[in-house]
Amino acid sequence: MGNASSIVQTINVTGDGNVFKPSAETSSTAVPSLSLSPGMLNPGGVPWIAIGDETSVTSPGALRRMTSKDIPETAIINTDNSSGAVPSESALVPYNDEPLVVVTEHAIANFTKAEMALEFNREFLDKLRVLSVSPKYSDLLTYVDCYVGVSARQALNNFQKQVPVITPTRQTMYVDSIQAALKALEKWEIDLRVAQTLLPTNVPIGEVSCPMQSVVKLLDDQLPDDSLIRRYPKEAAVALAKRNGGIQWMDVSEGTVMNEAVNAVAASALAPSASAPPLEEKSKLTEQAMDLVTAAEPEIIASLVPVPAPVFAIPPKPADYNVRTLKIDEATWLRMIPKTMGTPFQIQVTDNTGTNWHLNLRGGTRVVNLDQIAPMRFVLDLGGKSYKETSWDPNGKKVGFIVFQSKIPFELWTAASQIGQATVVNYVQLYAEDSSFTAQSIIATTSLAYNYEPEQLNKTDPEMNYYLLATFIDSAAITPTNMTQPDVWDALLTMSPLSAGEVTVKGAVVSEVVPAELIGSYTPESLNASLPNDAARCMIDRASKIAEAIKIDDDAGPDEYSPNSVPIQGQLAISQLETGYGVRIFNPKGILSKIASRAMQAFIGDPSTIITQAAPVLSDKNNWIALAQGVKTSLRTKSLSAGVKTAVSKLSSSESIQNWTQGFLDKVSTHFPAPKPDCPTNGDGSEPSARRVKRDSYAGVVKRGYTR
């Protein structure tokens, strides 16, 4: 049967001697960060075996997949399997002829960590009679000598000894047992977290304390009636002690108090020192900053040579516009009938059902030139607009998207005869109510949508122009004097690209982009009018990641140099020595340092400044290249240090939280006082509570044991 010894500790949840003294060095942690992504667990390869002893493994077909039938019986019956939770003995586990797979050390380590995570709740699982014996992944593994590889050709040069292998059935059975236990722990884990957050059980720095009996009284007073902690108080006490070294229970039988937490390594990494933030925090922040820089691809966004559009493009993001407020010469994807055209003209179009619709065109009417638009979704919202006139009430009226085709440019239209074909692709009916202001009628939220895809229009004639208009339509003729609006573009137009790889530059679709040439090449107006998939917007999105990385890493203030601003300073120092036109100004290093720092701070505040011509420093592509490459170098050469200001600020902030926490716990001990030695008690040793009747007594002992 084997040798075993047990240790039994007897605790009294409401008794004397228990300790509640959270500290930064004993902060509670129980979250197992498992790395179970497919890319980490696989591929470990598969085991291969030679067909015969006399056959050379280099011969064609000399290796075959190893199966469970190839494992000796002595290896199948794993004598080390003493847990029995998921037994590997052939009498208990289905012993079918299955292919074997190699298990990586990464998988073994993570499944073992998952087993450890379950044991935080061992006493509760025993109470439920779930997973009554601790699982042990290693008991399901068999170690064999074999060739290892994903293919036979790879395996023939990779013979290994003592390779851990497992069958799919055993692997599935093991994971199912872990999942069943986790399912049983769902509400239990929530209730434990409620108990740990109902009052402060952690402190960012230093130490705080409160009488444990006061803490227990507060929990008894405030926990929900259906909390599992009420039903299983003793098991909860043990589980909390394992998570938080500041919660300690006295062993009644021995009169000793011991720290039962199992997270000493993690807790120490989470605790700050006397002069520095926690090691875990510094590591995580540096990792985040480096991930952002990697995602931005500094080499791509600073390239001086063309980059293919699909490489430079980012996942498309919607952009909002008010078409009526965009300058036609900036928004090159718009067209407009000149305002000087005097007489409006009416046209009649149909929709896909053959219904006839009437609409008016006049001077000032605007359309989207679909020939300059990549596949796009248009959504127009007139919500909040009025469009009311003396003889025109928008309530009940219809607005629609109309697609035109004509060989005559839109800005030259003066009559319906100049239009080739037109169709209503979608329309909605408006609902409007009188505004609080006189003579206005506010339109409710609308969603007039159209998905434009060039293939729908059968563009075979290169001389044909295609346009999209949004305006009022009606089944009867619309009197021009009643409805005088040129269109309904005075609304919120949301444009969402339907393709990810297409890029435009100022309204023109391009096949490649020179990123460095984008720097300082847009006016604020042209940037505002650029399409959602414009190269400038792609550049700004990538540059924003650089700015965010700098913000995470850099705590320098305005006019202060830092590792991330000095790349600009170095470029400025050289550029002022270069021969050029005009009067050269030589700035000393102190001035250059401030100029570089201010440029970096402006970039962090608004990354789009690198694109617009208004930026005094970073609109120069040389300064931008220096910054993009310098930030990458700065982060790659950084250790686990923190900025001076960051360290001081975090420590002083942590001390303020510590003081607040202790003040709160002092109030807990005041309003839920622990019984004094001379206070009368009930028969079970607990103090009578005038506040409420106890629904579930915490009094009693728990015997906690484990084998070794």
Swiss-Prot record:
GO terms for biological process: symbiont entry into host cell via permeabilization of host membrane. Keywords: Apoptosis, Capsid protein, Glycoprotein, Host cell membrane, Host endoplasmic reticulum, Host membrane, Host mitochondrion, Lipoprotein, Membrane, Myristate, Outer capsid protein, Viral penetration into host cytoplasm, Viral penetration via permeabilization of host membrane, Virion, Virus entry into host cell. GO terms for molecular function: host cell surface binding. It comes from the Viruses. GO terms for cellular component: host cell endoplasmic reticulum; host cell mitochondrion; host cell plasma membrane; membrane; viral capsid; viral outer capsid. Gene3D superfamilies: Membrane penetration protein mu1, Chain B, domain 4, Protein mu-1, chain B, domain 1, Protein mu-1, chain B, domain 2, Protein mu-1, chain B, domain 3. Major outer capsid protein involved in host cell membrane penetration. In the endocytic compartment, outer-capsid protein sigma-3 is removed by cathepsin proteases, which exposes the viral membrane-penetration protein mu-1. Both myristoylated peptides mu-1N and phi are released during infectious subvirion particles (ISVP) formation in the endosome. They associate with host membranes and mu-1N induces permeabilization and delivery of transcriptionally active viral particles into the host cell cytoplasm. Seems to induce apoptosis in the host cell. The lineage of its organism: Viruses, Riboviria, Orthornavirae, Duplornaviricota, Resentoviricetes. The gene is M2. Glycans are attached at N12, N81, N110, N458, N482, N528, N659. A lipid is attached at G2 (N-myristoyl glycine). Belongs to the orthoreovirus mu-1 protein family. Changing N42A: Complete loss of mu-1N cleavage and host membrane penetration. Residues 674-708 are annotated as: Disordered. The C-terminal region, phi, determines both targeting to intracellular membranes and induction of apoptosis. It comes from Reovirus type 1 (strain Lang) (T1L). Heterohexamer of three sigma-3 and three Mu-1 proteins. Cleaved during the endosomal proteolytic disassembly of the outer capsid. Mu-1 is proteolytically cleaved into mu-1N and mu-1C during the maturation step to generate the ISVP. Cleavage of mu-1 to mu-1C is dependent on myristoylation and binding to sigma-3 protein. Mu-1C is further cleaved into delta (59 kDa), and phi (13 kDa) segments during entry into the host cell cytoplasm. It holds the Pfam family Reovirus_M2. The record marks N42, P43 as: Cleavage. SUPFAM superfamilies: Membrane penetration protein mu1 (SSF69908). InterPro entries: Mu1/VP4, Mu1/VP4_sf, Mu1_membr_pen_domI, Mu1_membr_pen_domII, Mu1_membr_pen_domIII, Mu1_membr_pen_domIV. This is Outer capsid protein mu-1.
